[in-house]
Every structure is written in C-alpha cells, then in structure tokens.
Amino acid sequence: MRLMKRILSAAAVLALSASLLVGCSSGTASSVPVSASSAAESTVSSVEETASSAVDENEAAAAQLLNDLTGSYQELWPVILADEYQQTWLDDCTALVGEENAEAAFEKLSSMVTGDVYGEDAVEAYANGGGAYFCGFTNDLATLTFDGETSTISGTDKDGNVLFSHTYHYIGMEPVRGLYEFQSDDADSGEFTYFFLAPDTSAETYHIEFRYGSDAEALSQYDTGEYAYWLASGISTDCDQTMIDNCIELFCTENLAG
C-alpha cells in the first residue's frame, strides 16, 4: 500500500517521474600526491565494498520477500470494494475526515484505483488531465501463486488452467519506488518474463502490489508506454474478515491522514 499511496499522490498532478542525479569528478595522476592517491584508492575500495554489501543485502531481502509472499493471491479491489464492506470504508473515512466528508473521500479513493484502461489507451484518455489506475490482473491471470522455497511464480486463469509456471531470479532494484525486480529463468515466458514486486506482504500490509510483463524498461514507467496507469494489487485467497478490515483501514489512513 505504500507504493500505491505514492502513486495516488503523484497521479493527482500527473507527475509520476523522478530523476537520479549522480556526480563524479576526476583528476590526473601526475597532479595527485602519493598520499592523496592512496587515500583516493582507499575511498574507492570502501565505496565498492559498500555497494557490494548493498547488492548482497538487496538480494537477500528479495529472497526473503519471495518466502514471505508464499501463497496464492486474487485481485484485491473486487474483494475489499464489495458492497458488504462499504460501511467499513465509510467508518474509516469518517474517523479521518469527518462524517460530512466521508462519502466523498470514499468515492475519490475508490475511483483512483478502479480505472478500466491502461497502457497507451490510458495515456490517450488522460492526455488532458485526470487519470485513474487499473489495478487488476492482466493477460487472463486470476490467481497468482508464489513458492519462496523453489523461487517459483505461477498463475492460473479463472477456470484453473495454468497460464505459466517459472522459477525466477533477482536482477535488481527499481531505484525510485523500491520494487524488487525478478526475471524468469525460462527463455520464452512472454508477458510473465519479469515481475516487479513491492515490499508488501499479507503479514505487514494485508495485500500485495506488483507489475509484470515482457519489457523491463517499460515496467519502470508509470505514465507512459504499454504498462502505463497499471499496478496490480492482490490479496490472499485465504483472506479473512480481519485482513480485509485491516487493509481498508491502512489504505484510508495512508491516503487521508494528516
């Protein structure tokens, strides 16, 4: 939900982009004293070790995330936006913005995550402003399953037919939003070649957020390209009333509080 919170905030001004600036300087060897050169070499070595350590930590965290995600997931929003939970939404909104504003807040929040277009169609539709995210599953996916022990991600359609089942390996981090990037070990994985996973789990945020597709670069873009205005959200197929209540409360709090 932390990722969706950032996206909703940015979507309000249609500014889902950021830049990472890296500076460096260099000098000639002849103009650097031996002591300074040694110090520089030591600094470079230290930076390299720190970077290597960060990579190791991210890779370990990615493996842990797959373990924590072990289980099966269905689309989030059809579950928690069902009519039977509307009063829960209104109660949580009331606690944050007051009874007189609760219904409007609920309508606004729900509208931002229930868009019905994504990709280039969404880019065209929202060219003059506005915009809502499509947060469902794509490519006929109905149930997504993680097996952390074998690093396997698989999916089935609404009839239970297997759409894909591959082992995946960690390939890096998305620097802006902190998604863990995984790539299939199978050459022909189509739209399930890459999975970008937010660090959300059922235990901590009561839901998960992720993207998947065949183009890693396009998956890093949120307001352009074939995956624009799309962020899949899921909830455990074993979710209970408590998990649903907690998920609704978290979403309201992160987007309406203070």
Predicted regions, residues:
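Sec-dependent N-terminal signal peptides of Gram-positive bacterial secreted proteins and lipoproteins
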Residues: 2-27
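Bacterial lipoprotein signal-peptidase II cleavage site
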Residues: 21-36, 40
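A composition-driven surface/loop motif
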Residues: 25-28, 55, 66, 91-96, ...
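Immediate post-signal-peptide N-terminus of mature secreted/exported proteins
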Residues: 40, 51-57
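N-terminal helix-cap/turn-to-beta initiation motif at the start of protein domains
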Residues: 56-74
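Generic short beta-strand segments
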Residues: 75-81, 156-159
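Internal, charge-rich low-complexity segments
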Residues: 79-114
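Calycin-type beta-barrel ligand-binding domains and close structural analogs
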Residues: 125-258
